[in-house]
Each structure stands twice: as C-alpha cells, then as structure tokens.
Amino acid sequence: VFENSAAIRGQKRTPGVQRRGQERRRAILDAAEALLAEQGYEAATLKAIGERAGIPTASMYHYFPDRHQVEAELLRRHMTELDTRITATLEKPEAQTLREAVDVMIDILWDYYRAHRSCTELWFTGRHQMLVELVRSFDDVQAERLWRHLVNRGLASADTPRLAVQLSFEVGNRLFDVAFRRTPQGDGATIDEARRLITAYLESYS
C-alpha cells in the first residue's frame, strides 16, 4: 500500500519535474545563443553558459554532457526554423528563372544568418564533428529538395545531376564563411560572387 502511494505521488510530480527540466534546457539554449551572438564561439563554454542561465556548472551536466551537445541542440533549433522558411518559399514559388531561384535560396540563408549570429558561429566557426555532420545532413536534404524543385518547374535542365546541386550547397557554405569572416553582416560583394558562381555552374547543364 505504502509503495503504491509513493508511486502515485511520484507520478503526480512527474509533469512538473518534466516541465522544469524543459524550461531549464530552454534557458541553457537561450543563454548559449546570447553568448555566441555577443562574444563568439570561444566564449560560449559550458561554465559561461551556466552562469548566463543561472544554473550551477555541476547541474549543467544533468541536461547536457558537454558544450558540444548544447551546440548541436541549438544548431538543430536553427535548422528547424530554416527548414520552415525554405519549405514556405518552395511551396509558394515566385522565381521564374534559375538565377532568381538561386537568389531566393541565398537570400533565405543570408537573411537568417544576419539575424542570428549564433547560427553563423556554429555553422562556420564550430568545427566539432557533430556540427559538421549536422550541417552536411541539412545541406543534403535541402539540396535534394531544391534539385527536384528546379527540375520539376523547368528552371534547370532535367539532365542536371543531383550532385551538382549538392556541390552548389558546399560551395555556398564556403563563400558564406568567407563573407561572414569579412564583415559581421556578411560581405555583400562576396555574396554576389556566390550568386554568379552557383548560377553559372548550374546553367552549364542547360
């Protein structure tokens, strides 16, 4: 009887405990985002994140084993938002040419990166293998979607290989990296060169 009563009391506490745990995880991610945006990648240590969130370092390990787990979770959050924006754009296409389609995709990414410096810090400065794999997976998914979109709408030749769009994302990443190393808002001249390079490359299959 006593065991059953204790179990019931434990079950009643569970939703509250879970809610507090979720709130703390959000607080940690928000603190990490703020530190990355204000002070850069190197400053966003697990200790600094905990201090910003008001959570003792020892307690931080209950939610995230190390800073890389925090970074990965925060990057996933950014990727979810980016995916939502890309999906909305592809579902209501306005681009009438390949160049316009390339511009639209670049603008989505550029606008988001400029508004979320923490994302650029993780995407381009963070070199942990976990982040690298997340970026690669995201790019592969988006490249597949964009390739189908371009071919289905006749904006790219049906002979355009999927690999060409995948490589375009790879090149785009490198040029975005250069652009944001040049200026905090992303160097416009470098972005313009990215537009020309990627468009010319994909048009070569026409």
Placement of each model-derived feature along the sequence:
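N-terminal positioning helix adjacent to the helix-turn-helix/winged-helix DNA-binding module
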Residues: 24-27, 31, 142
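Short hydrophobic clusters on alpha-helical segments that form packing/core surfaces
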Residues: 28-36, 78, 82, 109
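Amphipathic alpha-helical linker/stalk segments
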Residues: 74-101
